[in-house]
Amino acid sequence: MNKILKNIINKSSINNVFKTSFNGGISSSSSSSSSYLNNNNNIIKSYNVQQKQQQRYYSSFEDDLSPKKLKEKILENETEEIRDFVRSQRLTKKTASPLEGMNRKERRKMTTKLYRNPDNLIRGGIVSPQPLIPAHIKKPKYVLGEPVIDFEIDDPIEIHTAESIEHMRVVGKMAKEVLEYAGTLVRPGITTDEIDKLVHQNIIDRGAYPSPLGYKGFPKSICTSINEVLCHGIPDDRPLEFGDIVKIDVTLYYNGYHGDTCATFPVGEIDSSSKRLIEATEKALYAAIGEVKDGALFNKIGKKIQLVANKYSLSVTPEFTGHGIGQLFHTAPFVFQCANEFDSVMKEGMIFTIEPVLVESTSPYAEWKMWDDKWTVSSREGGWSAQFEHTILVTKDGYEILTK
């Protein structure tokens, strides 16, 4: 195993780099007790409403472009070892095809596109209080107060039993149906908070629990990431605008198991670049799924995603990964969404997510930043991103998509 990776994987800060939370990784490492279930009243305690109902700060267009400012704003949990690892992935690992990036014409065209009016960049809105959970809904242990245990890259990968697989089929089908419902709500003028509330009720009506709600303090039932926001966007009162694209990530907990899926939806008519971005990302997902089979190396997934990204002159994000899933929301393995040389082997009965995020950028590896809500991750350049995700079962003859 890569020595640098071994060093960083044992640090608690690894949760802030690789995907141990939903949508590809980065999250707050502390779990707020205010997010746990109030057993007496059978509701989730709301965050301090006064604290939450204020404008969240975002600054893609402020003066953090200077090297000095950038250095000062490096995430507190992003250690030098982590940055060294990312550099090693970018510079020293063999890749699916040469990472020459864009040619001069492509780079000039992309640079012109990225330096657009900063007023078009996404600003955080007001986040409403957490929704209530009825007493009869079964909650995951982390909502009841049990700490989340972060997994490590060399942890054993679960081989699911026939009974477990059947549970995963049921919750996977539910997640698929809820995501489809969420997609029907997307239109100009609706807020992501309104979408969250409607989806939340749809999940509750099925007797399921929205896995993100209360996970390490996340305040909502789904993730909604608009335009240049890569992942973990918190639903708020910003209305969707004509021409936006929005990533909706849905995870359900039902009968003790989690099912996870995500898709990118257009808001009204979108431009050709956005259509191309969505098309490329969905192709990357299915190209990667095609590599899944008993005995295959996990690194084939990342290499295939990177091949598609290179073909479309789009960027990948090494820090965001897929993950194992089952009775736990996130578990081994790490499923890297970029070219890598890790040699873990897929085996029949394993279940994990594949969830590429492709980004418009002038570099093969997109730079990102985190908002002060400690969840929302956006492109530093302002390039838009798309994401698609499925939960996959390794079968004797290949794979089964549990969320399709």
From Swiss-Prot:
It comes from the Eukaryota. Keywords: Aminopeptidase, Hydrolase, Metal-binding, Mitochondrion, Protease, Transit peptide. It holds the Pfam family Peptidase_M24. A divalent metal cation 2 binds at D260, H323, E355, E389. Its main location: mitochondrion. Belongs to the peptidase M24A family. Methionine aminopeptidase type 1 subfamily. Removes the N-terminal methionine from nascent proteins. The N-terminal methionine is often cleaved when the second residue in the primary sequence is small and uncharged (Met-Ala-, Cys, Gly, Pro, Ser, Thr, or Val). This is Methionine aminopeptidase 1D, mitochondrial. It comes from Dictyostelium discoideum (Social amoeba).
